[in-house]
Structure formats: C-alpha cells, structure tokens
C-alpha cells in the first residue's frame, strides 16, 4: 500500500470516527457541528498540503538552471502570483509522466517542476507548462476549488443527516455512510469534471497570454499527450464522466481560436 493510500484511509477513518462520536454526543443536532468540522478540515488541508503533506511523498531540490529559474520567477511576477522558490520534484522515481504545478499560499508559494518535464521538454515548453499552472492561480482556481470542496462536504453531511439521522451513532451504519458518500461522488462527477475542464481551458488561455508562444504551446501539449499517454478521442460518455482535462486536439483547436481572436482584435 502506498503512503498516499494509507494517508487517505487514515483521514477517512478519522472522519468516520468523528462522525459517529458526534452523533453519539449530540444525537439531536450532530449535523451542524459535523458539517462545520468537515468544512474546516477541507480548508485546513488546502493550506497544509503544500508544506506538510507534499514533502512526505516527494523529494524537492532547487532548480539549478539559474536562467530558467529566473525566467519562471519573472513569469510568476507577470502573472501576479510571485513565488518564493522554484523547485524540482523527483517524479522519475515513480513515473515517466511530466508535470509542473504551483503550490502553497502567500509566503509559501513555489513553482514545482518535475524532473521528468525538465528531461523531456525544451525550456520554452517548460515555461509554457508553468504559465498554464500560474494561470490557475491567476484565475483563483485553487481558492474556488477549496470553496467547492467545503460546500461538497457540507452537502454530503446534510444528505447523510436526512437519510440516517440519529442512526449514524450506530457503528454498524458506517458502511451505509460510505455507500452514500460513494453515491454522492458519482452523482456529482459530471458537474465536477465539467468545471475542471472549463478551468483547464481558462488556464490554457492564460498560458498563451503570458508567453505569447504558440509554437511552445503546440509542441508542449503534443509532447505531454505522448508522454502521459493521453486518449485523443475518448467515447463521449467517458469524456463527460471522467475527463478532467480537454483532449489534446481540443486544446490545439482552442489555441487556433485564441490566435484568430487576437489577430482580429488588432
């Protein structure tokens, strides 16, 4: 079992134990404090993950390419999301997939680039991928995602309350609570993947606005499609239910549309 799965199981078990304990202590009105506690936990995780959880699963080192590091810092300043550090993640220990992301808030914010991306991509492509991630921050997607998660756990708590009420205090009802959670996840999945794809398109557009580099955009997403084994033409139902990102052909078509809009605006 990986450490990530062990942590997920531990957090789930803690949440269930807390839920049962609250239902026993406050049988008539456990839902309100439970919803508040779960919402606070979702908020806390969004703050703690970059500085506490990520180092448990990955090793980080400074980016030794001083020129590229300076360019990425300048890009972050241009996006309005200045970063403290530019780090390299040792992703190659586990995968060949290439990635980058921006983690942390305020003084803990940093750009993280996987060593696989540095090995496989040109500096221009690395800048483009990082610009995409900075676009998520510029568009406030992390904050919106946190708010969405908080609303989700509150809604799930209220559904469990409506279905089980005081029976949640019975530990034998825990499997039913898990089943309700699974059902709610499946029901909400199409909406969540739709939102995710929309945010990815906005971040793609931001990457073009920040870099103005169409060639790097095209080559980066073609390279990522090959490296990450992306499905170029998934079945529509599968796409609607499971795909959190637009397909590579959609992303390239969006680039052409953006370029056309830019030319027409001049």
Regions found by a protein language model. Name each.
Residues 1-169, 190-266:
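Polar-ligand-bearing catalytic/cofactor-coordination segments
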Residues 169-188:
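Generic long, charged, amphipathic alpha-helical segments
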């Amino acid at each position: 079992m990986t450490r990530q799965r062990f942590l997920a199981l531990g957090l789930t078990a803690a949440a269930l134990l807390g839920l049962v304990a609250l239902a026993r202590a406050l049988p008539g009105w456990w839902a309100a404090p439970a919803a508040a506690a779960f919402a606070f936990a979702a908020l806390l995780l969004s703050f703690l993950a970059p500085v506490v959880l990520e180092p448990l699963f990955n090793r980080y080192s400074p980016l030794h390419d001083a020129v590229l590091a300076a360019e990425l810092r300048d890009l972050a300043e241009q996006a309005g999301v200045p970063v403290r550090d530019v780090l390299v993640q040792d992703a190659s220990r586990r995968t060949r997939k290439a990635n980058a992301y921006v983690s942390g808030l305020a003084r803990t914010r940093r750009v993280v680039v996987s060593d696989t991306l540095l090995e496989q991509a040109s500096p221009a492509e690395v800048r483009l991928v990082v610009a995409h991630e900075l676009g998520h921050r510029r568009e406030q997607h992390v904050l919106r995602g946190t708010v969405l998660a908080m609303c989700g756990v509150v809604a799930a708590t209220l559904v469990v309350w409506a279905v089980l009420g005081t029976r949640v205090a019975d530990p034998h009802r825990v499997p039913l609570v898990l089943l309700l959670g699974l059902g709610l996840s499946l029901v909400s999945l199409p909406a969540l993947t739709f939102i995710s794809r929309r945010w990815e398109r906005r971040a793609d557009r931001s990457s073009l606005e920040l870099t103005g580099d169409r060639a790097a955009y095209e080559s980066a997403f073609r390279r990522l499609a090959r490296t990450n084994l992306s499905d170029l033409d998934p079945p529509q139902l599968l796409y609607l239910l499971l795909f959190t990102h637009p397909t590579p052909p959609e992303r390239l078509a969006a680039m052409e549309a953006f370029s056309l809009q830019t030319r027409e605006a001049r």
